[in-house]
């Protein structure tokens, strides 16, 4: 009997496969729903997530930013740099069961991150990067067992670092830098035995550096800079044998440098600058043969640099400036083949500069200024052919400048002032094509300097030397901003080439032997701020064209042989503050306008035939010459009567014109039916009939918008501090039309309340349009606002403080011009995020307070980050924004701090310049902030040419 075999699948196998398929489908559907839920909570203006939608296939593996494994499960979500905003409302997306990587860095996401993100996220998660956003709130507690990388840097997180951070036992990378974290660095970090990279920089951490860090034997990178850490550096750090990078800068660390740091044989970067370290540098430090960059600057270190420095054969950068180091500069530095940057300035080094310095090095920057160095310059300094900065000022160096520097074509910045150099300039020195800054002042240099060819030159100071001959032709130096040739023996006339400086701001030719007339063409230098031609032999008249100067502040023509009358329109230069015309041959009357109104007697003395009706000038009064003839008497009487009549008529018009030009007109008073008395003060006559008290009060019911009979719109705002209004009205009287200031047209007040009426400009607030603005438009906004500030600070006397420079207070009109709505003190609420430290603490408001607010505005325009929520302000976020910016800028990660919508490839150099300016404007000490004129000059002088930006050189290249 034959037997047939039939194969049947057991029913339980079919059932199992069915449920597996069902489970697979459910998982797939669950992933899709979680991802779409994430998409619904954020804004995606550039439509990067357009592929995230229901479709016939519903295959999430094809979606932008999503990566799946070989069984089509989502393992990676990378949406970095997509310009997305909004909040992550739940941690649901983080629960995708196979998810290993989440990267949401470099966006504009904000708000707190979900509190359960570290307790409910997928246990498979290994990489979490939320850096460079605007997240706030505290860092959640919890534990992810397999997490390798946690990067929350460059956000606005607050609060303390919890001790349970120590349970993330698998972490290799922890970066919490660039936030507003407070409290101590937890010692529990020592439990992260596998950690390789630790960054807590640019926060507000206090206390000491925990000794427990010495247990983290796998650490390669420690960055705790830009905090408020104190105490001594733990010697236990010297036991971290794998350490490559140690950075503790900008803290309050004190005491000696532990000798154990010399045991870090793999160390390549050691940065301890800007602390309070003292004592000698341990000799063991100079045995670190792998060290590339060493920076102990800005401390109180003493002692000498040993010859052991010759062992550091990998060293490229040595920074020991601003300490109390003594002795000679060791010969050992000359044998460091890779040495590029040597900065030892502001110490007490003595003796000569090592004879072969530069011969066996690769020098690009040498700064030994402000020491006690003597002797001559080595002729080997530029042997590498790469030397760009040579800074040796304020020493006692002598002899001639070596001929080799005349052939150093790489030089860009040379500062040799305040030494004892003598002899002639080396051949070729005045034809170096890349030099942009040259200061040789206060030496004993001599010779003829009539040949000059430096096309990149921006600043030249040859003052206090013995140069002679005629003035050079600087026609090739179109970029010159400052030229100081004072206190030499230069003769001859001013050459025509001197009139062709489109950017010159400071011109000083004083104390020479220059002759001839002052060229009228000099007035074509529209950016000239300071002009000093004193103590020469100029003849002829003061050019009337000088009235065309637009920003001239100081004018000194004293001690010449100038004759004729002073041009009457010279006093019309609004920016002119100081004038000195003493000791000339001038005659006639002194102008009674502008800077001449308060001129000091010493500034006009020595002009025998000069007179003035201003007794404070010390000049004799101007007298009318009288004759005795009867005909003359009748002529005088008739003329006097005619003049009186003319004065009477003119006076009426002058008063009228004065009222109109100063925008001060009669006060309108009205009493309403309920007995309330109102006063309306107008500042422009054309609006006097535009609205009444009733229409002003009615506008308060219609979104505070007032429309006159011609359809012109105005905005009505309530004055917050009524008592301040009278003194504020005097401020408003100073304001005339300026294209970058919203015009205040009137005030309306009763005994209990007051309102301010200003024009309503068609356009949008800066806060509404900032995202996505091109660099060109941002530049225009910066310049427009600082021009408004210059008008308020420099053209109004006394100066007017703008007060509020937040993007909410700046309107971009239809012509793309920024318009500042004045926040006069006492009138409009200040935005605390833009408030200077002295204003917050002492209620002091000055022009330097405005500069601080402008600096914050620059940071906002550069980074796209703002700090305007009340919670952030109470936590000191605007201070943290500045600290974060300093941290980011000092490391020059331009792509991490610049707004992603700005094209850095074209404007990188200009952006870096503006960031540097922003940090100067936000200095804690008001005295360290630049004045408004300097801010404007800095903005105008920035160029968009590209420049290299390495990790550390950006800091050092801005120092000298």
Curated annotation (Swiss-Prot):
Repeat region (LRR), residues: 71-96, 97-120, 122-146, 149-168, 169-194, 196-216, 217-240, 241-264, 265-288, 290-312, 313-336, 338-360, 361-384, 386-408, 409-432, 434-454, 455-477, 478-501, 503-525, 526-549, 550-573, 575-598
Keywords, comma-separated and alphabetical: ATP-binding, Cell membrane, Disulfide bond, Glycoprotein, Leucine-rich repeat, Membrane, Nucleotide-binding, Phosphoprotein, Receptor, Repeat, Signal, Transferase, Transmembrane, Transmembrane helix
A single GO molecular function term of this UniProt record: peptide binding
Positions of short motif CLE45 peptide binding: 221-226
Superkingdom per UniProt: Eukaryota
Segments on the Extracellular face: 30-634
Protein name in the entry: Leucine-rich repeat receptor-like serine/threonine-protein kinase SKM1
Protein source organism: Arabidopsis thaliana (Mouse-ear cress)
Lineage: Eukaryota, Viridiplantae, Streptophyta, Embryophyta, Tracheophyta
